[in-house]
């Protein structure tokens, strides 16, 4: 089991396009817009009428998880693939749902996104039947998928948040304020719920029939609120822990600085006293004229001035050191708090996994592993912090706007160029520029297309578009940017 999870963890983001999740959105939105156009055609027919529903929705809802499965199965089937076991592939299938059946409003988490494309229908069926995750004709999540997803969420909500703090995307004060505000929102929501329950209770008491069953729903809701208050308590404990760490670490810094300052002053004074003693002994043992005595006084005065300046410089340096040291220790406190949170989140996940294992194994568990644990709110607040402080950061927003132009331009060029490639009349239909674009696409992707057998025209056209998606989604951010600049003469 650890080996399966380790492999799945290393591979789970392999399908992400350049610029991450925003890149996914750009690809899907581009196809939604283009497929609505009547002039987006193939042999004079609108392409939206050639493709079937699943093909269209695959293109309109590009998903990194589905792309990962495609890469690990289809695109390495040339005899040199990585030969993953079905248990690993099934663990990576986070959403065993096709593009015609998913909905973010679904209660069941497995249907929140599409998990595989039309092109992988057969392999997914084979995987699920082999591993036993097809139950009563329906695909369900592999049990280890829940752990993979939880590990991904914990890393995102802790390690990524820690990196963002280290880069200065938010201050400790901003984080604490945000965390407190989110807790207040949760508590206020509970107060509203209690008030609504009391309104209903008053109405029922007014029309009381004398049966306790009349109040069962309200009693049940009160029990849920009491349980949720426990969750809020544990969520608050995270903030208490962070504040305590910062308080202690900063106090230690201040104490250290005071000790250093006092020690320096003592050393300067001792040095000054020793100097005076030495000079006085000279006066007693030697015959000195008036000028010598004046010189000694001048030397003493210089020494006093230097000592005063040294103490002042030391104080100023200490203030700067204190500021830097304080920042370091605040980061250290935040880092320790994140480690503390991480352990609690892992504990919560393991509790839910073991407590719900029977329903997970039977394929009826519908939630993530934070559901109904003491840190259900904590993970949501941490994810919200990432959204607030990282994704809405100006530098990130500029990068995403740039990413939109880059990906859309590449799709415009390569998708339109590929329509008539490898057709009988491709010389007539393709422009010289179209042919050049096709030559840029990696040969291994074109070979994969050429050796595939298709049932009809729709499969051929769909597979060409998927080939371009494979090409673009396989780029790094920098490669996509450089290719865009080269194609558009931006140097």
Feature locations, PLM:
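Substrate-recognition/cap regions that form aromatic- and gly/pro-loop-enriched pockets
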Residues: 355-443
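A glycine-rich, aromatic-flanked flexible loop/lid motif
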Residues: 238, 242, 300, 307-322, ...
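Sequence-structural signature of the catalytic-core scaffold of metal-dependent phosphohydrolases
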Residues: 1-7, 14-243, 247, 251, ...
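Charged/polar positions within long, soluble alpha-helices
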Residues: 73, 156-159, 163, 351, ...
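C-terminal amphipathic alpha-helical interaction region
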Residues: 454-482, 486
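Short, charged/polar, low-complexity loop and linker segments
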Residues: 130-135, 326, 386-387, 453-460
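Short, hydrophobic/amphipathic alpha-helical patches that form generic packing surfaces
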Residues: 94, 149, 153-160, 335-336, ...
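Zn2+-dependent metallopeptidase catalytic domains
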Residues: 351, 425-426, 484-491
């Amino acid at each position: 089991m650890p080996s399966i999870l380790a492999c799945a963890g290393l591979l789970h983001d392999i399908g992400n396009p350049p610029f991450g999740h925003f890149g996914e959105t750009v690809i899907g939105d581009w196809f939604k817009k283009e497929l609505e156009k009547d002039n987006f055609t193939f042999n004079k027919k609108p392409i939206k009428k050639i493709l079937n529903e699943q093909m269209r929705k695959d293109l309109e809802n590009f998903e990194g998880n589905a792309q990962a499965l495609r890469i690990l199965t289809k695109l390495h089937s040339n005899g040199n693939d990585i030969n993953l076991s079905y248990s690993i592939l099934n663990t990576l299938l986070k959403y065993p749902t096709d593009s015609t059946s998913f909905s973010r409003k679904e209660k069941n988490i497995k249907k929140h996104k599409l998990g595989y494309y039309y092109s992988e229908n057969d392999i997914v069926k084979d995987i699920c039947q082999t591993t036993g995750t097809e139950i009563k004709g329906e695909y369900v999540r592999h049990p280890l998928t829940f752990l993979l997803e939880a590990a991904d969420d914990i890393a995102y909500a802790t390690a990524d948040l820690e990196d963002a703090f280290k880069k200065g995307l938010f201050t400790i004060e901003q984080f604490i304020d945000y965390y407190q505000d989110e807790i207040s929102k949760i508590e206020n929501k509970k107060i509203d719920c209690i008030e609504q329950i009391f309104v209903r209770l008053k109405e029922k008491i007014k029309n009381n029939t004398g049966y306790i069953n009349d109040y069962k729903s309200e009693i049940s809701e009160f029990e849920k609120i009491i349980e949720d208050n426990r969750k809020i308590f544990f969520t608050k404990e995270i903030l208490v822990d962070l504040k305590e760490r910062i308080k202690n670490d900063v106090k230690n810094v201040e104490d250290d600085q005071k000790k250093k300052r006092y020690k320096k002053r003592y050393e300067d004074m001792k040095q000054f006293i020793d100097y005076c003693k030495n000079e006085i002994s000279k006066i007693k043992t030697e015959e000195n004229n008036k000028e010598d005595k004046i010189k000694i006084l001048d030397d003493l005065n210089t020494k006093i001035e230097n000592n005063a300046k040294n103490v002042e410089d030391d104080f100023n340096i200490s203030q700067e050191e204190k500021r830097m040291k304080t920042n370091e220790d605040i980061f250290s406190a935040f880092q320790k708090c994140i480690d503390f949170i991480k352990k609690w989140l892992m504990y919560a996940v393991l509790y839910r996994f073991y407590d719900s294992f029977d329903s997970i194994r039977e394929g009826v568990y519908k939630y993530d592993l934070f559901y109904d644990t003491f840190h259900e709110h904590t993970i949501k607040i941490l994810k919200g912090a990432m959204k607030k402080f990282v994704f809405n950061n100006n530098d990130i927003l500029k990068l995403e706007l740039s990413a939109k132009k880059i990906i859309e331009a590449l799709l415009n060029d390569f998708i339109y160029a590929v329509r008539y490639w490898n057709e009988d009349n491709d010389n007539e239909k393709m422009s010289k520029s179209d042919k050049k674009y096709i030559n840029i696409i990696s040969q291994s992707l074109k070979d994969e297309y050429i050796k595939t057998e298709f049932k009809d025209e729709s499969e051929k056209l769909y597979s060409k578009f998927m080939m371009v998606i494979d090409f673009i989604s396989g780029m790094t951010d920098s490669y996509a940017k450089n290719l865009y600049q080269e194609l558009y003469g931006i140097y």
